[in-house]
Amino acid sequence: MRYGEAGQSHLLPFLGAAALFAALTIMAHSVVLGLAAVIAGPVPAAQTALSLSRKAVSGAAQEEAASVAEAAPESTGTAASQPEAAAPTGGIESYLVELLGDDARPEGAGAVIEKNYPQGSGEKYVACGAGSIKNNTRQTAADIAAEIQDPLPFGVEKDSPDPQILIMHTHATEDYRLSAGLWYSPGDGARTTDMNLNMCAVGRVMADTLNAAGLNTLHDETLNDYPSYTGSYENSRAVVQRYLAQYPSIKVVLDVHRDAIETEGGSRMAPVCTVDGRQAAQVMIICGCDNGGSVRLPGWRQNLRFAAAWERSMEGMYPGFTRPVLFSYRFYNQDLTTGSLLIEIGGHGNNLNEALYAGQLAANGLVQALLGPDT
């Protein structure tokens, strides 16, 4: 019954008592449904697609001079997770999300440019197996080449009841694009506090993969860069120190980020490669070096050996997967262990699925670097 038909009350005298009751019941039901429809109203297609994509994410278990400054997080609230036993992973498909199609592309969308960044050559680069190290320090290439031939300064125990690895995120709110096409929404600050869409989702895949391989791994999901980006490294340092005090068995601390490479025209770069027929984000390890002054890293040589071992492993397993290790005068709290590194998983131009897959591949490479090729 349409709402306007309710005014046709001149029929009522001709209805019996039972028929009158039925008519009034039907009329009331129609009015309720009509009002509900008016209140709900139509949902724009792009908004619907984004909502579906985020629901799919929630249900899925889930720098270099070129980098640009990024905006503040888009969401409100802060969260942290205590370490939990991670579920074994049977494949990347269980983590992947539904991406937005071109029907959701807004007017004025920015462009994304895909690029595979090759290994470097020349005097600034030191060969590292199939990979390479970009030397932005005063250390000689010969010194670096000799150093990375030495064994790892630590050993990890497989199937240990004690944690061996900690994964955390200084810039946890960094995120990725949610579009399948090469575009991003105008005004997208590439940050979110949604831990199914930001760096925590990538760290989760890495931790699951490492735990499934017998490497006891903790994953901290503290949003160290929220609500303030300033002071995020001080925040994450305190987090790591608490874990090391509670779990002195931890040998490796990985600070997992993503890069942000952008052209002068505003196009976002997506470092990509193809592994086993699936597109993945490229990754880049950053290892700091002591400069004798403002950057104090007495254990930089040990960290560099670790970086080289991981780089060799990843690039050997997945050719084209890594960008050269960046060896530079950067601190990044890498004084806390002899196995402390920062790794960039793709950039803000990559879509989330490429980053999730890259996280799994990077973890596979770490397993081989720490346990050997026969694991």
Task: List where the protein language model places each region.
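N-terminal Sec-pathway targeting helices
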Residues: 1-21
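N-terminal catalytic or cofactor-binding beta/alpha core of small enzyme domains
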Residues: 17-250, 260-265, 360, 368-374
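Active-site-adjacent mobile loop/cap segments within catalytic or ligand-binding domains
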Residues: 320-375
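Alpha-helical scaffolding within the catalytic cores
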Residues: 240, 265-273, 325-331
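Solvent-exposed loop/turn segments at secondary-structure junctions
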Residues: 172-175, 223-227, 258-263, 290-293, ...
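Envelope-exposed proteins and targeting segments
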Residues: 161-164, 213, 250-252, 279-283, ...
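Active-site-adjacent substrate-binding region
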Residues: 299-326
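A short, glycine/acidic-enriched catalytic loop
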Residues: 185-189, 261-299
